Structures are given as structure tokens and as C-alpha cells.
Amino acid sequence: MEDSMDMDNIAPLRPQNFLFGCELKADKKEYSFKVEDDENEHQLSLRTVSLGASAKDELHVVEAEGINYEGKTIKIALASLKPSVQPTVSLGGFEITPPVILRLKSGSGPVYVSGQHLVALEDLESSDDEDEEHEPSPKNAKRIAPDSASKVPRKKTRLEEEEEDSDEDDDDDEDDDDEDDDEEEEETPVKKTDSTKSKAAQKLNHNGKASALSTTQKTPKTPEQKGKQDTKPQTPKTPKTPLSSEEIKAKMQTYLEKGNVLPKVEVKFANYVKNCFRTENQKVIEDLWKWRQSLKDGK
């Protein structure tokens, strides 16, 4: 946790490139590249090593001295140049972490080394913007609190969950039938109100008086006619058949194979069967208890 918090608090780095160049010759064969800035990260990226126009036709060897991964001093040859054979070498971005010493090991020069000085500066402006974006509003914090507190874990046996799921499916079917009946009953008065509004919205005379509505009104329906319209056939609900003894045994066997345990006392076992499998048949319960005692798993 602490490492992740430290990584979040680190501001993003904004790289800056600066030109770098040095000259190595007979009277100055070494160039030391050191950085005293400890707050930012620095790197030296070497691009080319080339001979000057006045260089003699002899072998020029340029080496670099730095620190390896283990913190020990190491020397490597960067380029071997000769005016008549190879006057320049492209290093293609040879990056070295300072301190670095560039040295003309052989030859009189002049030799020119060019590249880039890379500095990674902290982008304070972007870090401030990110802090503002990550600050949660007080309204959101108040809304999150009750939601997290209202979550309470529940543990149930798998057999109880299966039985409850089957009961919920039956209840949902009954609720759907009731909702369909309610919607059909609600549609009837809506149609009546629409018809009365259309009757009242007849054209007015030029004098501003409404025409007689007696001829356009419908005759009221008798209670017998209303009863015929309201009474609609409903699909009969199929009663839920209780599970047989063999079906209950199969479910209990699956329950045991998953590492669970059945009650060992007859009274508790009977209550378990009644609650989980919704059966009141005493013969079925006695048959299941005999089967429970005959199990060889010892559970």
C-alpha cells in the first residue's frame, strides 16, 4: 500500500533536451561531464564522433569512462577514426548516465563529440491539475457512505438457495398474472373518460352556446353487461407438486458430495427435510431417515 501511494504522489516528468558538444585534441585530451543537480534526472545521449579538418592521417581512438550497474568504474571505446578511412562515426543516441569522462586515448585530434543533454524535470502544473481532478466532491462522498454501509453479506446453503429460487419463480409467475389483470382493469375506465371528453368537446354555436348533448350520449350499461366485460378468463394456476423421495435423495447425495453434512439427529433431520424440501409426508420423512442411517460415509 505504501509503495502504491508513493507512486501516486510522484509528479510526472517533463523531458528537456539541450545541445551537447566537446572538442578533444592534443593539449586537452579529456572532457569531464558532471551534474550537481540532484533533484532532476540527467542523461548524456551521444550522437556523432567526427575528426576535424586539420586532423592528421593517423588512428584516433576515443573512449568513455563511466560507472556500470554495480557502481564500479568502467572504460569503453566509443570510436576509432582515421581521415582516409573513416572520418566520422554515428552512435545513434548512445545514452550514458553522468558522471562521464570522454578521453582521446590515441591520436592528436581534433575530435568533435556531439549529442544531447537530457533533463527530466517535474511537471508541477500537471500534478496540480491531477490533484484537483482526483479530489472527490463532498456530495459524492455523502452518497457513497450509505451505500457501502447497507451491504450485508449473507450465507446460505446451496440446497436452501435452490429451493428458494424455485419458490421465487412461482411467485413471479403469480405476480405477472396479477399485474396483467390490473392493467386490463385500468384500461376500461380510461376508455370511458376519453369518450366523455370527446362528447363534451363538441362544436359551439356562433352565439357561444353549446349544442344539446342528449342525442349523442350513450345509454348506460346495465350491471350485467359490465360484469360480462370485467369478468375475463384467467389461466388456472398449477399447484406445485412435492418432490418424491428419490428426488430428495438425489439432491441430498449431491449436497454430500460437495463436502456438506446432513443432520445426525432424527428430529433435526425431519425439520431439515420439512424446511428445505417443503414436504409434510411422514412416510417420505421416515424413508429418508432410514436412507440417512444407511449411508457409509459416516457423515
Swiss-Prot record:
Region (4 X 3 AA repeats of K-T-P): 218-242
TM annotation in the entry: none
Sequence repeat windows: 218-220, 221-223, 237-239, 240-242
UniProt biased composition (Low complexity): 232-242
UniProt GO MF annotations: chromatin binding; histone binding; identical protein binding; RNA binding
UniProt entry tagged with the keyword Cytoplasm: yes
Primary subcellular site in the record, as a coarse category: cytoplasm
Maturation and modification: Phosphorylated.
GO biological process terms, semicolon-separated: chromatin remodeling; DNA repair; positive regulation of transcription by RNA polymerase II; regulation of centrosome duplication; regulation of endodeoxyribonuclease activity; regulation of endoribonuclease activity; ribosomal large subunit biogenesis; ribosomal large subunit export from nucleus
Record's subcellular location: Cytoplasm; Nucleus, Nucleoplasm; Nucleus, Nucleolus
Keyword terms, alphabetized: Chaperone, Cytoplasm, Nucleus, Phosphoprotein, Repeat, RNA-binding
Motif Nuclear localization signal boundaries: 153-158, 189-195
Composition bias, Basic and acidic residues: 188-197, 221-231
Acidic residues: bias regions: 125-134, 160-187
Annotated spans, Disordered: 125-247
Positions marked as site (Interaction between pentamers): 57, 82
GO cellular component: centrosome; cytoplasm; nucleolus; nucleoplasm; ribonucleoprotein complex
Role according to the record: Acts as a chaperonin for the core histones H3, H2B and H4. Associated with nucleolar ribonucleoprotein structures and bind single-stranded nucleic acids. It may function in the assembly and/or transport of ribosome. May stimulate endonuclease activity on apurinic/apyrimidinic (AP) double-stranded DNA. May inhibit endonuclease activity on AP single-stranded RNA.
PANTHER family linked: NUCLEOPHOSMIN, NUCLEOPLASMIN
Oligomer status and interactors: Decamer formed by two pentameric rings associated in a head-to-head fashion.
Family: Belongs to the nucleoplasmin family.
Protein name: Nucleophosmin
Gene coding for it: npm1
